[in-house]
UniProtKB/Swiss-Prot annotation:
This is 4-hydroxy-tetrahydrodipicolinate synthase. It is found in: Cytoplasm. The active site is at Y133, K161. Disulfide bonds: none annotated. The gene is dapA. PROSITE patterns: DHDPS_1, DHDPS_2. It catalyses: L-aspartate 4-semialdehyde + pyruvate = (2S,4S)-4-hydroxy-2,3,4,5-tetrahydrodipicolinate + H2O + H(+). Keywords: Amino-acid biosynthesis, Cytoplasm, Diaminopimelate biosynthesis, Lyase, Lysine biosynthesis, Schiff base. Pathway: Amino-acid biosynthesis; L-lysine biosynthesis via DAP pathway; (S)-tetrahydrodipicolinate from L-aspartate: step 3/4. The keyword Ribosomal protein does not apply. Catalyzes the condensation of (S)-aspartate-beta-semialdehyde [(S)-ASA] and pyruvate to 4-hydroxy-tetrahydrodipicolinate (HTPA). Pfam families: DHDPS (PF00701).
């Protein structure tokens, strides 16, 4: 259903913290024009944790409106409350999103049975296609392959964004790829993941180098390892630099350097430390983004 380079898009904000709707629409146009294959609105990179429910729904609707059917929109609707996730997922469906991305519940650390029941309940409540998102480094909770294998039997659970190890990607592709698509959630592993059978990447780097990420993933999807490796070598420093501080701090600053939005970010996150500016800037130049 989805494939290629899918951007986990930043949410532009004014200095007072209000959502910058003009820049939001500009970003959507930019991604349409520069090869991005789908947009994730209000995921982790889109500052979902610091948007309230009404803002969350509003941004998803605005991205859909700006997309005008030119590019698929995936709404980030995960929460550590099942009922909140259902509400957000329903809002995404009613707002015109093509699918949703559901992060593993964070902080409250459910059991594997709890995770199964959480995602099954959302899938049962809202008929929209849903992509699971496993990022144990941020959630302190790991959605294990046995649980993914069970969830893959639910018809509207169509994929998983896996942000752990390349070994896990291999395992999920082997177990589940006949029923759901596997996507890399780690930019630095995306080339290897796609060559191993993943259908693409949900990418932070694509905010800054969308055409390059599209071209790299497209090469890997067609099995052109040499071309994928050549492009990825130019992106490697950027993959790393965008995580010098907590995501989305560096990428928000990087996008601002491209003139696409301002650098403002909501507390408790803060703008990128000046000591990291030059490292990010040089990585952007190497990638061809500046």
């Amino acid at each position: 259903m989805f494939h290629g380079s899918m951007v986990a898009m930043v949410t532009p904000m004014h200095p007072d913290g209000a959502v910058d709707e003009v820049s939001l629409a500009r970003l959507v146009d930019y991604h349409v024009e520069h090869g991005t294959d789908a947009i994730v609105a209000v995921g982790t990179t889109g500052e979902s944790a610091t948007l309230d429910y009404d803002e969350h729904c509003h941004v998803m609707r605005k991205v859909v409106e700006a997309a005008r059917g030119r590019i698929p929109v995936i709404g980030g609707t995960g929460a550590n409350s099942t009922w909140e996730a259902i509400k957000l997922t329903r809002c995404a469906m009613e707002g015109g999103c093509d699918a949703t991305l559901l992060v593993v519940p964070y902080y409250n650390k459910p059991t594997q049975d709890g995770l199964y029941r959480h995602f099954a309940a959302i899938a049962d409540a809202v008929a929209i296609p849903q992509i699971l998102y496993n990022v144990p480094g941020r959630t302190a909770c790991d959605l294990l392959p046995d649980t993914v294998d069970r969830l893959a039997d639910i018809s509207n659970i169509v994929g998983i964004k896996e942000a752990s190890t390349i070994e896990r990607v291999h395992d999920l592709v082997e177990r589940c790829s006949d029923r759901l698509d596997v996507f890399s959630g780690e930019d630095g592993l995306s080339r290897e993941a796609v060559l191993a059978g993943a259908k693409g990447v949900i990418s932070v780097t694509a905010n800054v180098a969308p055409q390059q990420m599209h071209d790299m993933v497209a090469a890997a999807l067609r099995g052109d390892e040499e071309e994928a490796s050549r492009i990825d070598a130019r992106l490697a420093a950027l993959h790393s630099a965008l995580f010098l501080e907590s995501n989305p701090i560096p990428v928000k600053w990087a996008v601002s350097q491209m003139g696409l939005c301002g650098p403002s970010i909501r507390l408790p996150l803060t703008e990128l430390s000046e000591q990291h500016h030059e490292t990010v800037r040089q990585a952007m130049k190497l990638a061809g983004s500046l």
